[in-house]
């Protein structure tokens, strides 16, 4: 099943990957990403744990209707969440680089 040293190499790779994943999780938790909507009139910043850190609303929107402002805030939150997910996937791809993972295997994020 495993060639000469195959199991040992597999265990070594698994431990290295676990260490890299731990380091990556710590880095991702520190990330902050800003999502925007309305051409930058609404900005929402979230961290790697998807917690909202900041909401910025252009003063010109305070005069417009409430429904539009609510829609722009929701769109900015969704944009920020999408951006943090993309960043996490990119970082995790670098961790698993070289590992032969089964098709469809998902990292723990």
Curated annotation (Swiss-Prot):
Region (Disordered): 1-21, 90-109
InterPro entries, per the entry: YbaB-like_sf, YbaB/EbfC
Primary localization: cytoplasm
GO cellular component labels: bacterial nucleoid; cytosol
Pfam families, per database record: YbaB_DNA_bd
Location of this chain's protein in the cell: Cytoplasm, Nucleoid
Key words of the record: Cytoplasm, DNA-binding
GO terms for MF: DNA binding
Positions with biased composition (Low complexity): 11-21
Taxonomy, superkingdom: Bacteria
Quaternary context: Homodimer.
Function: Binds to DNA and alters its conformation. May be involved in regulation of gene expression, nucleoid organization and DNA protection.
Name of the protein this chain belongs to: Nucleoid-associated protein Spro_1136
């Amino acid at each position: 099943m495993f060639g000469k040293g195959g199991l040992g190499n597999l265990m070594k790779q698994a431990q290295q990957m676990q260490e890299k994943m731990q380091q990556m999780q710590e880095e991702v938790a520190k990330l902050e990403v800003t999502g925007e909507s309305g051409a930058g009139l609404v900005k929402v910043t979230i961290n790697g744990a998807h917690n909202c850190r900041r909401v910025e609303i252009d003063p010109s929107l305070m005069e417009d209707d409430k429904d539009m402002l609510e829609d722009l805030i929701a769109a900015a939150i969704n944009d920020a969440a999408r951006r943090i997910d993309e960043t996490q996937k990119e970082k995790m791809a670098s961790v698993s680089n070289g590992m032969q993972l089964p098709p469809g295997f998902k990292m723990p994020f």
